[in-house]
């Protein structure tokens, strides 16, 4: 079934240390969407994939700029899905323009996006990249290994982490987002809980994936099923 006539383009945004190719193309998710008739707009965030990779943290202060550029000056809404950092960037874009999106799927984020940034958590991950984290700090080491994948620039990814942070998202701003929102999180994801985030949206549903951690989420079959259903691509 070709559904382009009924549905807008679908913007897809990867997470920290990923890229459109690594996150959405290699897994076959983009192919499933295009075979159903969806038009995909793939975005590589600054510091990732085919985008420029500056090493100055200040270059990453506007995290959603690549998304807003990809959307352009459209007169109609688009759909979007983002994982982890990509979900945060999409949420930032939606607060810049609450009418950007028709349907918005946020994957792998929780209540933490409503709280003040904790620099010590960033330093944990930076330690993982630099190889200075404690041997028992599994999460930091996972992030470090992720940063050192062949196609990545660890210095650029460290700069992303050290970027100037905006104030936390506020529920009153999230209430203005006109999109139907779906939040998807694995039951073993460190970003849980997500109750305050869910309650901040006017129209939001939550899906918890069984036996799934943060890094496994984009390739989880339950996630892919939910994505196809939410965006009408079944």
Regions found by a protein language model. Give the residues of each.
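Flexible "cap/lid" loop of the alpha/beta hydrolase fold
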Residues: 88-132
């Amino acid at each position: 079934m070709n559904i382009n006539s009924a549905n807008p383009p679908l913007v897809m945004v990867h997470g920290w240390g990923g890229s459109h190719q690594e996150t959405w193309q290699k897994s076959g998710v983009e192919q499933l969407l295009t075979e159903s008739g969806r038009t995909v707009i793939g975005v590589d965030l600054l510091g990732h994939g085919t985008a420029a990779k500056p090493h100055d943290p200040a270059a990453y202060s506007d995290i959603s700029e690549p998304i807003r550029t990809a959307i352009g000056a459209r007169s109609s809404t688009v759909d979007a899905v983002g994982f982890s950092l990509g979900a945060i960037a999409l949420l930032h874009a939606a607060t810049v323009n609450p009418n950007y999106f028709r349907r918005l799927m946020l994957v792998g984020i929780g209540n933490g996006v409503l709280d003040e940034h904790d620099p010590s958590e960033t330093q944990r991950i930076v330690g993982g990249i630099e190889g200075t984290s404690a041997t028992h700090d599994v999460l930091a080491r996972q992030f470090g290994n992720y940063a050192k994948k062949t196609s990545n620039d660890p210095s650029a990814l460290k700069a992303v982490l050290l970027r100037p942070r905006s104030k936390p998202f506020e529920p009153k701003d999230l209430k203005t987002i006109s999109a139907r929102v779906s939040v998807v999180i694995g039951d073993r994801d460190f970003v849980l809980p997500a109750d305050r985030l869910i309650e901040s949206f006017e129209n939001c549903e939550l899906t918890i994936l069984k036996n799934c951690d943060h890094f496994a989420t984009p390739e989880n079959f339950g996630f892919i099923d939910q994505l196809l259903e939410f965006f009408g691509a079944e």
